Amino acid sequence: MSGREGGKKKPLKQPKKSNKDMDEDEIAFKQKQKEDQKKLDEMKGKAAQKGPLTGGGIKKSGKK
């Protein structure tokens, strides 16, 4: 048992699965994920325009 034979025998990266192998459920799931991501990006854009929601909370006085 030499030191060179140890370790993983299989490759680290798995071969990519082609799009033809995906069934209808996987295609629908990916489409739904894309739509959700678009909605999330739109909401982030709208939220960035309005500014921060903070402003209340505990106010500290300058006295010690």
Swiss-Prot record:
Positions of region (Disordered): 1-64
Positions in coiled-coil regions: 21-50
Annotated Basic and acidic residues bias: 27-45
Mitochondrion is among the record's keywords: no
Key words of the record: Coiled coil
Residue ranges with Gly residues bias: 53-64
Record-annotated membrane-spanning stretches: none
Family annotation (InterPro entries): TMA7
Assigned protein family: Belongs to the TMA7 family.
Protein name per UniProt: Translation machinery-associated protein 7
Underlying gene: tma7
